[in-house]
C-alpha cells in the first residue's frame, strides 16, 4: 500500500497539454523532430509542436543486490512517459514528472501532432549469442518463465511507433529479432529505428541486428542499450557498441546528446547508423565528482 505512483505529490500540472489541446495540428506537420539520448534505452522525442515523450527511462534493480547504473535517472518533466516492457532498465515511468503515462501501450494514442502505436510481441528469450547467456541463467536460477507463449509478464514487449514531423520512429525495446509476419506487417514502413545493440550483444547479436535493420529498411538506425563507462556499471555486463557501429557503412557519431532531425534529411539516408556514443542529454553527476 505504500508503493505506487506519486503524481499526487507533484507540484506541476498539465496546463501545457491544455494549451496543445486547443491547437491540434496534423500528425504530418512540418518541422524538425528532436531526438535526445538519456543512456540505457531511454530517449526523449520532441515533436515539431513541442510535445515531449520519454521512452524507457531506467532505474536500478529494485531487489538491491547489485546496480546497473551509477546514479538515479535525472529529474525530467515530459508530456508523455512510455515504457516498452516491465524490466527495471526500461520501466521507470514513475520517476518522471509526466502528464500522461503509457506503460506497455498496445493500440493507438493520438494527441497534438503525434500518433503513437503500440504493437504487442515478445522480449528476447534466447541469449546464447551473449557471453553470459542471461536468459538461460534466468530460467535455471529463478522460477521465471521466459519463453513464449507462456512467459511471465516481464518477457512481453511492446514495439512503439511514434509518428510526428513526417517521420515514423520505431523503438524496438528488447523485442525478439524474429517476430511473426503479422507483427512485421503491423510495423510497416519505418524511417528511424531505435535498436538495442551493444558490444556484449546482450539483446541482439550483430547478425540479428543486421537482419532486423535489413527487414525494416529504416533510413536511420540508432543504437541503445549499451554500456557507457560513466553511466552504467561494470556489473551490467553491457559494452560500448563501437564494433557494430563502425562495421556499418558511413556511420555517424554524434557530437552531443541530442539532435534535430528533419524528414528531408532522414529520408535521404539508407540504413545509416547514427550513434550517440558516450553522449547523453543530461549532466552526468559522476562527471562533476571525483571519478568512478
Q: What are the roles of these predicted feature ranges?
A:
Residues 14-32, 38-82, 86, 90-101, ...:
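Pre-active-site segment of Zn-dependent metallo-hydrolases
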Residues 144-216, 229:
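Active-site-proximal loop/helix segments of hydrolase catalytic cores
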Residues 1-17:
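N-terminal non-globular leader segments, chiefly Sec-dependent signal peptides
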Residues 93-120, 209-227, 244-252:
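P-loop/Walker A phosphate-binding loop and immediately adjacent motor/lid segment at beta-alpha junctions
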Residues 53, 80, 167-169, 192, ...:
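Structural motif
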